Amino acid sequence: MIYQSPTIQVELLEDNIAKLCFNAPGSVNKFDRETLASLDAALDSIKQDSNIKALVLTSSKDTFIVGADITEFLGLFAQDDAVLLSWVEQANAVFNKLEDLPFPTASAIKGFALGGGCETILATDFRIADTTAKIGLPETKLGIIPGFGGTVRLPRVIGADNALEWITTGKDQRAEDALKVGAVDSVVAPQALEAAAIQMLKDAVAEKLDWQARRNRKLSALTLPKLEAMMSFTTAKGMVFAVAGKHYPAPMAAVSVIEQASTKGRAEALQIEHQAFIKLAKTDVAKALIGIFLNDQFVKGKAKKAGKLAKEVNNAAVLGAGIMGGGIAYQSASKGTPIVMKDIAQPALDLGLNEAAKLLSAQVARGRSTPEKMAKVLNNITPSLDYAAIKHSDVVVEAVVEHPKIKAQVLAEVEGYVSEDAIIASNTSTISINLLAKSMKKPERFCGMHFFNPVHKMPLVEVIRGEHSSEETIASVVAYASKMGKTPIVVNDCPGFFVNRVLFPYFAGFNGLLAEGGDFAAIDKVMEKQFGWPMGPAYLLDVVGLDTGHHAQAVMAEGFPDRMGKSGTDAIDVMFENKRLGQKNGKGFYVYSVDSRGKPKKDVDPTSYGLLKDAFGELKAFEADDIIARTMIPMIIETVRCLEEGIVASPAEADMGLVYGLGFPPFRGGVFRYLDTMGVANFVALADKYAHLGGLYQVTDAMRTLAANNGSYYQA
């Protein structure tokens, strides 16, 4: 053994080829500080052994290296620039040491080689992947750029255009695609991987392959004619900005770094990367996006833990077909859990099956599935008009019409057809789980399971704990949601649960602006372009449906009359009473049609303005800051109330619920990250300016205390 540490082992193989194996404790290899220090020490040991003629890098895991240890990032990025620069330079010195070894090097890549893992393989002369490999630099998704030489080496290996696409999108690349652009030299079967890498090194040692020429190319400036370079980078800037926009600076910074470094050798090029990396690491956007990544890991970790208490779900059922039932059936079946789709009407079953078939056909058309897989998934969906079909179901999801009496009747019926230990969940967005539980003989095996529409696109599922729901029930539904590919958050029962409870105060702020003559299209523009929502409040209400919004608003008003009760008519009432239901009937705040390419199109409709003018008078302009404050303050305070009341368990789960359930702008990180970034005291001062607008603008006592103590919701 040449070198051994808890994360890396180096041994000498036949023909004096050294093998460096990444073997960290745990299921995957990460590039944390310990691994980086071990790699540095291992390379020193390798350099001192004069017998070594070549080096192969391998992994003992199913993956090569999944990337840096992101849990270290927020603490590290909070350090002074000088400390951060020192860390980046030390890390890069290790990668340079690997690249500068006096003999050929190769990486044998299986599974993921992402971020720092990808930058490791780029520092070797040859890269051999097996068919399971996925390679990429996802750093721009975290609001930063590669910091271990990725922006320098990748363009010199695969060309500027390809590197720009890889880095600015942050997408993983399959082994075959990596081979096409020259990121890897060969793709082999998993069992042949190490032998293929070693053979390539033998050929290099025997001078059949020119490893030094390959290395020199990475150490030099990019060989790109001036005009071609100018066109390439100008085009990239336009395309990247069109996708990333002004709120996500990292992709544009990556283009700029690659352009500036293109005429430099390695040392100068790395310095350009370092400076840009440090600048981005200090941004609020990086903190927000890294926070989302960590919150996602936290929520998934809780779901994994819940799996230990969960009843195994091998068969499921959904009651109520149609679009929602079909979406749930598709999601369950496509992730491997057979499901019965039960309804009382054949046309509804047909609609549900057609919905599943449509979603599967779209997957096949995009090349993400095959007709054989589609057939297998459809065979996992059993339509039935008879309750007898659900008797072996481990979990039954009730998804009938959103009406308390109908749901209660169906829930009482279904209990008589399933096993004693079957779990029943209601897919409801507004009806109290405790109320519905009254119709159950065994309320302990009942909870809420709120899917968001469209089911196949929306990643969030709210699992609602009733006062009688058992831990096994909650754990089982959380585990089933995870198995379906969803991100579950557990919330306690209250009107609107978590997501709708915090959404409707936002709509109330919007209604307040319109009642004073606000222009709904102007408000949407501010909330989309400046705050960063995917849809402004008027557009979102049209998508949700004004009938749905009208009903949910009434539920919220009844549940929280002191804050959400309303006197008189508001804009939602105006649209609903005039049968303007939104996208579903082609007219709401906006009017909807189909363009010449068959794509849905929305336009401002003078009729909407006329109706609102009749109700609220002439239009009045509001400043952008005023629009943002009046819509967001109620949502933020209600989110804080949910945390304080224990409706949601943590800031992390609340923020994930907002990002995944409502499309809260990821670059802001969620309400609690937004509050920490703004400063709780600054938010309290802002909210107090609007306190005269009513109960939704009243800051809680606990918030005031936190503000007075200069506290924050996250510890990092």
Curated annotation (Swiss-Prot):
It holds the Pfam family ECH_1. The active site is at H450 (for 3-hydroxyacyl-coa dehydrogenase activity). One of its GO terms (molecular function) is 3-hydroxybutyryl-CoA epimerase activity. The record marks E119, E139 as: Important for catalytic activity. Pathway: Lipid metabolism; fatty acid beta-oxidation. GO terms for biological process: fatty acid beta-oxidation. This is Fatty acid oxidation complex subunit alpha. The gene is fadB.
